[in-house]
Amino acid sequence: MKLSTKVTELTNIIAPAVAACDVALWGIEFAPQGNRSLLRIYIEALPEEQAQNKQVTIENCAAVNHQVSGILEVHDPISGEFILEVSSPGFDRAFFSDEQMHAYVGQTVSLRLIQAIGEGDKKRRKATGTLNSIDATSLKLTATDGEQFEIALSNIDKANLIYEDA
């Protein structure tokens, strides 16, 4: 889940504006698309508000959109036109850093890998299962078919939480 140089640059510019709106920055997606790019910002309630079961509201999204628009006008880090979207990460949230996954140990995650894992005809570049543990270099996953994997964090291209209605 290595962030591109552009996403890192945008994060450094945008993070203070998001914090000024009293919400937490979960992550940023940037997709250059010809003459018009897409910048998607995910925000969530601050930890102390999450403890009180407070969620991100449409008003939070609008405030961040307004604040970030102003910052981007000043810094102009995106060439050409762009679409700015602000939302919560949702139930099936993407993970933007390894650290974000720690809070979801015991839950189901979906991984897209850089290099395949497994043996023979059971090799796979995608794995879905229970996140058993995570440390500084790897995670342990029990796949939905029961197979156990230890996966290097450096081998993860994309990771998402899989929402399961309790």
From Swiss-Prot:
It is found in: Cytoplasm. This is Ribosome maturation factor RimP. Belongs to the RimP family. Required for maturation of 30S ribosomal subunits. One of its GO terms (cellular component) is cytosol. InterPro entries: Ribosome_maturation_RimP (IPR003728), RimP_C (IPR028998), RimP_C_sf (IPR036847), RimP_N (IPR028989), RimP_N_sf (IPR035956). The lineage of its organism: Bacteria, Pseudomonadati, Pseudomonadota, Gammaproteobacteria, Moraxellales. Gene3D superfamilies: Ribosome maturation factor RimP, C-terminal domain, RimP-like superfamily, N-terminal. The gene is rimP. The keyword Cytoplasm applies. Its main location: cytoplasm. Keywords: Cytoplasm, Ribosome biogenesis. The keyword Mitochondrion does not apply. One of its GO terms (biological process) is ribosomal small subunit assembly. Coiled coil: none annotated.
